[in-house]
Amino acid sequence: SIRMEIRILEADEHPHYELKISDEHIHKTFVRDASPVFHRTKYLNRLMQEAEGAIVGIWDTDVLLPKEQILEAVDAIRKGNAVMSFPYDGRFYMLPQEDSLLLKKREMNMEECCQKIYEYVLAHGPNSVGGAFWVNKNVYIKYGGENQHFYGWGPEDAERCKRMEILGLPIYRAQGPLLHLFHPRMQNSWFGNQRLEYANRMEFIRVAGMTRSQLLQYIWLSCNSWGINIC
C-alpha cells in the first residue's frame, strides 16, 4: 500500500472550485492571481515543496491511468532505478467526447476503454512525455524542479526530459497507455500569444543546447532568482 496525499492549487481572481469530499490527506489551496495566463511551472514548484512525501506525482486533471501502471512507476523510484518515472509507455490516447462522458457517469470503465484503445487518436506519436509523471522529490528539486522560465502553455514536458538526459539522470516508463479525457481547449491549453510562444520555444532550445556543466550553472542561477533553495 502507498500512503498518499493529494494537493490541488487553484489560481484565479476568485475561487471557483470546491472540494467534493473532506479528507485530511487532500489539501486545496487558492492563490489570488489576476493574470489570464496560468504560470503552471511556478505553482507546481510551490506544491512540490509543500508535499510531505519523498516521491511526488505531477498529474493533469484530465488523464486516466490503470492503477497497476501507477504502482509500477512509483516502484521504479522507490528502488532507486529512476529519478523521473512515467506511469505509461508513451502512448497518449485522446478519448472522444462520448466515451469521456460515459466514464464520468461511470457507465464505462478503464478496462473497457483499454479494450477499444486502437479506436482512439494517438496524440503526439508513441513517445509522449506529458500528462503524468513521478519524481524523486529531493533530487528533482536539486536539479531545478519545474522550469519557471516557461510562462503559460509551452514545451516544458519535453524540456524536463531533455534536462534529465543532459544531467545523466535515469528515466523509467511503465508498460501501458495513458487516456486523455475530452474537454474544450481554452486559453491555457495553447500558447497565449506569439510573444509567449516564441519565448517558451526559445527556452527549450536554450536548455537543449547546453552541456552538463552549463546546465548546472543555469539551474543554480535560475533557482536563486526564483527563491528556490537547491543546496
Short names for language-model regions:
Residues 34-50:
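Glycine-rich, basic loop-to-helix element that forms the pyrophosphate-binding segment
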Residues 53-64:
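Short beta-strand-to-loop acidic/aromatic patch adjacent to the donor-nucleotide binding site
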Residues 127-128, 148-231:
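C-terminal catalytic/acceptor-binding lobe
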Residues 66-149:
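Conserved catalytic core of nucleotide-sugar-dependent glycosyltransferases
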Residues 11-13, 89, 176:
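Active-site loop/turn elements of alpha/beta-hydrolase fold enzymes
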Residues 1-34:
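Acidic donor-binding segment of Leloir-type glycosyltransferases
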Residues 40-45, 62-63, 70, 128-133, ...:
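Conserved glycosyltransferase catalytic-site signature
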Residues 51-54, 145:
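Active-site acidic short loop of glycosyltransferases
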